[in-house]
């Protein structure tokens, strides 16, 4: 969701609460739980899951390996669920022409630097830069070049924008900020 007026442009950034992250976390949780149950079934010699008879899977080495994969999968799944619940990467970009200030806010991982807040003057913005890498995995990222601070990404690297969409977004932002566009 974006909000735009003559003097203020606010762009909300979705973080890790995407449908694909929910799907991957859920699939990984169920799969790793299945692996762990099969490994435990082979150790106990009982059927904890009725789909796989435990007599067919020997505990050493198959049961140990399946238990290890199950535990590793549960750790990765819990990491994904934590990033989803903390909504890591979400935030907003606020461009205020009236005040002449740009604010970029993102949520990070819990700790001392959970809130990432960048604030600088519009006069320090040198340009809006589009970085394009074509190939098997094309990547198009929009950056804001700041004097003395380098380039700050405005779009996520996994956001697959078409060339037309990234050009339009860059043109609108450059027009709003009254800065040039660079393409790399």
Curated annotation (Swiss-Prot):
One of its GO terms (biological process) is photosynthesis. It is found in: Plastid, Chloroplast thylakoid membrane. Belongs to the Ycf4 family. It comes from Platanus occidentalis (Sycamore). GO terms for cellular component: chloroplast thylakoid membrane; photosystem I. Seems to be required for the assembly of the photosystem I complex. NCBIfam families: PRK02542.1 (NF002712). It is a multi-pass membrane protein. The chain crosses the membrane at residues 22-42, 57-77. It comes from the Eukaryota. This is Photosystem I assembly protein Ycf4. The gene is ycf4. Keywords: Chloroplast, Membrane, Photosynthesis, Plastid, Thylakoid, Transmembrane, Transmembrane helix. Its main location: plastid.
